[in-house]
Amino acid sequence: MQTQRLRIAIQKKGRLSEECQGLLKKCGVKFNIMGERLVVHSENMPIDLLLVRDDDIPGLIMDGVVDLGFIGENVLEEVRLERKATGDACQFETLSRLDFGGCRLSIAIDKDEKYNGPQDLAGKRIATTYPQLLKAYMDRQGVPFSTCMLTGSVEVAPRAGLADAIADLVSTGATLEANGLKEAEVIFQSKATLIQRSGEFAQDKQALIEKLLTRMQGVQQAKESKYIMLHAPVDKLEQIKALLPGAEDPTVLPLSAEKQRVAVHLVSTENLFWETMEQLKELGASSILVLPIEKMME
């Protein structure tokens, strides 16, 4: 099903949904999500947002129903493996791995149990919401096991006598600890990613995708970068430049009232730590400012 408007699928609710909406708004896409609507139309671009369950997004992309989708790599790979196993279409293209939505899929066991490696899991019953990812990992390790498929509250399975171990998403490990479990093996690392359907796009739609990608890259670069400004004595300029963590040479400008000092400006992809600022001050630098960058385009 093809339309003239760019169709983008995002998760209906949750932290990933909020991050994706924020990213699109920073890219200049205006929209207003109200109530329980499935489709939201952009106010200033030919873009429609489809608000759906996260595990529906890969299928919508692979079946060509929508053009782009924001999805966690864990969900994407689980659906891809499932479709591959059943012979269904599983083609897509990855456009950009994003800098949010980070988590890991890990096997966790009883906190008092000794663990020497994957072979210790042989013959165990493992509860999970990600049976395909778990099977792929265990097959690579050559370890036989059985699956207990659960769609929620996986962490309580061992305590309830449903399983010997679990494979679940972990961010901080606090939930595992609260349920008497410990992380034993990381089997998949995940971040949010932007994917698109396979096949060609109309010229205007392809141009819009490229524009969005350029803006997204700019937003992510800006988030990782700082704008640094300071005044420096001319005779210490080279020493000061050596301390500054810029990717390119800084801009050096004369000061109107002082001939022996200059203004130094640069964009840095690294933070300027207090220790570095103190070293700069010892060399005679003053008016040191470290500012966030809202937008950036190289």
From Swiss-Prot:
A GO MF label: magnesium ion binding
Record carries keyword Ribonucleoprotein: no
Main localisation: cytoplasm
Entry's Gene Ontology BP terms: L-histidine biosynthetic process
Pfam family, one: HisG
Database matches in Gene3D superfamilies: 3.30.70.120, Periplasmic binding protein-like II
InterPro entries per record: ATP-PRT_HisG_long (IPR020621), ATP_PRibTrfase_cat (IPR013820), ATP_PRibTrfase_CS (IPR018198), ATP_PRibTrfase_HisG (IPR001348), HisG_C (IPR013115), N-reg_PII-like_a/b (IPR011322), N-reg_PII/ATP_PRibTrfase_C (IPR015867)
The EC number(s) this enzyme carries: 2.4.2.17
Record comment: activity regulation: Feedback inhibited by histidine.
Catalysed reactions, as listed in the record: 1-(5-phospho-beta-D-ribosyl)-ATP + diphosphate = 5-phospho-alpha-D-ribose 1-diphosphate + ATP
Function: Catalyzes the condensation of ATP and 5-phosphoribose 1-diphosphate to form N'-(5'-phosphoribosyl)-ATP (PR-ATP). Has a crucial role in the pathway because the rate of histidine biosynthesis seems to be controlled primarily by regulation of HisG enzymatic activity.
Similarity-based family: Belongs to the ATP phosphoribosyltransferase family. Long subfamily.
Protein name as annotated: ATP phosphoribosyltransferase
Organism: Vibrio vulnificus (strain YJ016)
